Amino acid sequence: MTDYVTDIAVIGAGPVGIFTVFQAGMLKMRCCVIDALSEIGGQCLALYPEKPIYDIPGYPVINGKELIDSLKKQSEPFNPQYLLGQVAEKIEDYSDYFLIRTTTGIVVQSKVIIIAAGAGAFGPNRLPIDNILDYENKSVFYQVRKVSDFCDKNIMIAGGGDSAADWAVELSKVAKQLYVVHRRKNFRCAPNTALQMDNLSQSGKIKIIVPYQVKKLCGENGKLHSVIVKNITNHEEMALQVDYLFPFFGTSANLGPILNWGMEVKNYQILVNAETCLTNRNRIYAVGDIATYPGKLKLILTGFSEAAMACHHIYHVIYPNSPLNFQYSTSKGIPENC
């Protein structure tokens, strides 16, 4: 029994997956989008909704939530079907269509598959502390959903990469006290961000605690009141008053069932033809961060371009006897009866 029938099944509802809906719609192809998360947006919305993005054409700066909202609005005329909280588990190839089965038993029939799953399913790298689960989503968070929620609070950021440094700069604007704890004296972040952190440290807006690491969380009922940190050189410990802790140690990605679909994979990325984004499997494409080829740039705008290339190639697969006369969107507008 088939629950949904579509032209293209898009695996992943991040920015590139949503833009794929628009590109397909401009060619009068319907999309059904499958994503494991409970809302569209992928990592862009789940991890960085208020983090500024500077390399989207036409936007001097835009945050993750604003970008996803704009992409969603842009794709709405094409009435995509979103299947959220669903993992595409198995695919069955019937020569001219696929059946895609999700972990909850939903079956989607699709002529073509486009994988736009970013880094795949992902989760945070946790601190090795026994009781950290007691505090997660209460006073320990792995993303900043809304900066204003942390106004006038004592905040600790643990980590030394770009995410830790970027959010230290952003949260210093609203925090009562902000600690940045790192096991090394040097931060692995953009030079300009490192300079900003240094200036904020000198002005007292940020207290940089190095070379230390988080040792213990203290509180009750999931609410922190202090964090004990330990010097990794002389083993000295100190307790710092903390309301919220943000461990920024990156995420662990897992392609999950996609690894079993027969595509060529290298370093957890799917190898594709650079001109069409076609994988080694007929009628299965990959775009965005999950796709790779010589010279690939892992940028959102690169994924947008790949979505357009894939959809134009797919048109000839779905409509082999119907020529595609290329037109700019300014000429043809939004197709009707999509």
UniProtKB/Swiss-Prot annotation:
This is Ferredoxin--NADP reductase. The keyword Oxidoreductase applies. It is an enzyme of class 1 (oxidoreductase). InterPro entries: FAD/NAD-bd_sf, FAD/NAD-binding_dom, Fd--NADP_Rdtase_type_2, Ferredoxin-NADP_redctase_2. GO terms for molecular function: ferredoxin-NADP+ reductase activity; flavin adenine dinucleotide binding; NADP binding. Binds 1 FAD per subunit. Its cofactor is FAD. Its EC number is 1.18.1.2. Homodimer. Keywords: FAD, Flavoprotein, NADP, Oxidoreductase. It catalyses: 2 reduced [2Fe-2S]-[ferredoxin] + NADP(+) + H(+) = 2 oxidized [2Fe-2S]-[ferredoxin] + NADPH. Belongs to the ferredoxin--NADP reductase type 2 family. It comes from Ehrlichia chaffeensis (strain ATCC CRL-10679 / Arkansas). The lineage of its organism: Bacteria, Pseudomonadati, Pseudomonadota, Alphaproteobacteria, Rickettsiales. It holds the Pfam family Pyr_redox_2. FAD binds at D35, Q43, Y48, A88, F122, D289, T330.
